[in-house]
């Protein structure tokens, strides 16, 4: 199999082209070359079920009896049981039901660009699920002075 190589004049990575009978990675594809970049359009489709009928079940947490699964006075929009739905197994239906990346960002009260700062130790207020997944979500302004850190 051909290995990728770096074009010395542009510094771009050129992807190997499959030989005859080898369109690449087990999928049928067509290829266009744009400059030094080989762009492949695959006909391979993601094999997944249509979860539109069971959206209510998508985010129903499956608690294992673990006391850490249920959080009282949760300041976040999602419970640990709901977040577990994203991981085991990876669930694109749950990701969509959470509002995608922006919904997760809002529900977990963070910023995808900057993350959390070291001085963010206390969260004021709460956010519920509907607020987090809403496209018009506007987070509450942060307090002017951060809470002091405990020694």
From Swiss-Prot:
Keyword terms: Conidiation, Sporulation
Compositionally biased region (Basic and acidic residues): 48-60
Region described as Disordered: 1-72
GO biological process: conidium formation; sporulation resulting in formation of a cellular spore
Source organism, top-level taxon: Eukaryota
Protein name: Conidium-specific protein
Gene transcribed to yield this protein: SpoC1-C1D
